[in-house]
């Protein structure tokens, strides 16, 4: 079971960031931000867990995107994630 470890309210007073302990693939969230290699090959760590739980569609979408320079970001669907 996930538990909130800490949280902060941003200066705009409309946003809250929560630090939560638990399985990131089981949380209903707006987005997951995950560090990845430039070729978007999700073969280990958090990236692998996301693809295993969310489905191969996440890797397939990443393959279509291809190379991503360091410091840039991309968006995929969540697959079967909540």
Predicted regions mapped to residue ranges:
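Macrodomain-like recognition of ADP-ribose-binding/processing modules
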Residues: 1-82
